[in-house]
Amino acid sequence: MTVTIRKLHPHFFGEVSGVDLRNPLTPQQARDIEAGMDEYAVLLFRDQGITDEQQLAFALNFGERETSRGGTVTRKEDYRLNSGLNDVSNLGKDGKPLPRDHRTHLFNLGNCLWHSDSSFRAIPAKFSLLSARVVNPTGGNTEFADMRAAYDALEEDTKAEIEDLICEHSLIYSRGSLGFVDYSEEEKQMFKPVLQRLVRTHPVHGRKSLYLSSHAGAILGMSVPEARLLLRDLTEHATQGEFVHVHKWTVHDLVMWDNRQTMHRVRRYDQSQPRDMRRATVAGTEPTVAQQAAE
């Protein structure tokens, strides 16, 4: 089958047809989808009733799987999924919605903040692929922001100001902004800040983009208040309506996005109702900047 892509937003976000993800991709299909990611940054595949194994097999066409270690406060023995996918649901191991005061639930509320997946890792994620298995009846839309278009729209003096800036990223920054500040010593070590460039250049088409995330909490060479004001201003700019596409989920949607070129967030929803979303994450291949101690 031939891969076709229909653009859904003036800047980015395409809807793919001509692919059944229950079946292995042909080499040409894999090339076409990766080229689509380079161009559109986010791709939607509708009506994909896939298993965890099929979702992971699809993801592995585009690189190696990123492990979940270092991105959660959930203990391994409490994982609901053991298939290699990331659990982005509101469900516990028993399949029921987590209590509102459950530590995992409170930590996961950070997904409602604008972010790029795994920017808190020294080598951040390349692609994320999210499959909707159970959709919440109200709310829960995911918003995506095109960081390329946002960069292009900056004033030239702002581009010059931020070109060489290096940020510190950590889950402690994003969760701390919501008042989640209680960590074990092991978690503090696991969530130690890493360094990321504020401006990234895409390895294929060479287009520049802002590399923002709620995980960013400091900029090297700046006071913390000054850095956070700049990051807030840039985030407000980058998430204006003209750069954002809102996706309303239906069951068996699969959305795939490039973390190097976008940010996203989930909107609030009724946490008493189940929402089962499962993510395969394709690992990045190199850091955005050479790492050093980010204390």
Label every model-predicted segment:
Residues 2-256, 260-295:
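Fe(II)/2-oxoglutarate oxygenase catalytic core
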